[in-house]
Amino acid sequence: QITHAADAWLSQPELKAIEKPDVVVSRSDPITLGFDGSRGRSKKKPDATALVGCRVSDGHLFNIHVWEAPEGPSAKDWRIPEAEVESAVRDSFQNYNVVGFYADPAMWDGHVAQWEAAYGRSLKVAYTRDKPMAFNTRSISRVVAGFEALRAAIVDGEISYDGSFPLTRHFLNARRQSVRSGIVLRKPNDNYLAKIDATYAAMLAFSARLDALGKGVGTARSGVPRRIY
């Protein structure tokens, strides 16, 4: 059973209140993407890599894919399946109306540069003109603002999420850490193998969504939602 600690970023009741597993995101709905990648290893187990979507019209967050090492001895030799990540990004642009994509380029800068070259011109929202996707996570103030806005939207019930196990687990794993600019997120002190990468990906997708709204992108719903086969 998942529980939450005193320094948890979110509680189970707060997440449960916005859970909407039956929401269907259509091909025509403008969405934003957030990507947090990893190649590092923590105590012989690699961090996760996550790709999360956010519908611009209502802020609905949904898991596209989270790649994590399996439990047990096989985790020792596990590596992030780069081909699967590339395929998931490509499929997202084919299957959804992607208007913005913010990605943490750390250790994935070559991939992010390739995605910018392939899809950058199609985006309505850009982090910068030269690097439309590469979100500068070294800008602590921007990260703090991103998590503050996301948490407020969740706690106030302004958005929803798909209730997927990876997103739920990563959200509840996140712990608050005070810095000069505000609050950033970290792993639990007593469980450094716990993953929070999807929480960062969700923040990036939500930040892109806010920037899209600021530009008037995706504010009108179009079409009837339909499943993607």
Located regions from the model:
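Nucleic-acid-processing active sites and adjacent nucleic-acid-binding tracks
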Residues: 23-24, 42-45, 52-103
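Long hydrophobic segments that form regular secondary structure
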Residues: 27-42, 55, 192-195, 202
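ATPase catalytic-site recognition across NTP-hydrolyzing enzymes
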Residues: 1-35
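Metal-dependent DNA phosphodiester-chemistry modules and their immediately adjacent helices/loops
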Residues: 63-64, 114-216
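Acidic, metal-coordinating catalytic cores used for nucleic-acid/nucleotide bond scission
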Residues: 102-112, 139-140
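A short acidic (Asp/Glu
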Residues: 43-49, 108-118, 147
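Beta-sheet entry/capping signal
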Residues: 29-32, 48-50, 59-63, 98-101, ...
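Acidic, low-complexity intrinsically disordered tails
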Residues: 215-229
